[in-house]
């Protein structure tokens, strides 16, 4: 019984720590949103938030960063953007070796694989709408399935209650506003 009380108390401490980080970091995130890309890459800011704010374990962080790199590569390919060879090599390795071999993914693939699948389907639907010139708020939201996976990772690591309490911080990780998206789509 003492062990059970210990684990319950430990769980409450983790939730309290996550809530505190979320409350203090959301101000930190919003105050730096405009300079995020000037002072670091998106991967840098994602990693920093995964460590400092979301308190994710190393394997989960590596899996999420690898997934980010793969998603960015495929998005650049589809958009016809210039691709850096080193980035392509890293993403190929991540897609074929790093992601499936990651211990966090292996432990949770029954949850993560359907989420990745759904994110791809939502991205494809969004892309189809955008190519038809019908970009809208829904296509903007559907193209950001990566952040659904980040939130699910928080839930897997810290539990449902913690994910509910810190979800708004995950939402703020998305670096593009609806206005920026609509402007980009009108110029495409």
Identify the meaning behind each predicted range.
Residues 1-188:
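All-alpha prenyltransferase/terpene-synthase fold signal
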């Amino acid at each position: 019984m003492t062990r059970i009380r210990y684990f319950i108390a430990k769980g409450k401490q983790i939730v309290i720590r996550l809530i505190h980080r979320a409350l203090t970091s959301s101000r930190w995130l919003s105050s730096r949103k405009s300079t995020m890309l000037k002072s670091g890459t998106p991967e840098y800011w994602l990693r920093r938030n995964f460590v400092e704010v979301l308190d994710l374990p190393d394997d989960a962080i590596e899996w999420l960063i690898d997934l980010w790199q793969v998603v960015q590569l495929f998005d650049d390919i589809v958009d016809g953007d210039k691709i850096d060879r080193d980035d392509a090599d890293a993403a190929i390795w991540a897609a074929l070796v790093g992601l499936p071999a990651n211990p966090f993914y292996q432990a949770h693939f029954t949850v993560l694989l359907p989420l990745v699948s759904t994110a791809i389907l939502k991205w494809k639907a969004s892309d189809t709408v955008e190519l038809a010139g019908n970009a809208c708020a829904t296509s903007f939201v559907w193209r950001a399935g990566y952040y659904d996976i980040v939130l699910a990772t928080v839930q897997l690591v810290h539990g449902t209650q913690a994910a509910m309490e810190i979800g708004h911080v995950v939402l703020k990780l998305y670096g593009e506003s609806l206005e920026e998206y609509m402007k980009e789509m009108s110029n495409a």
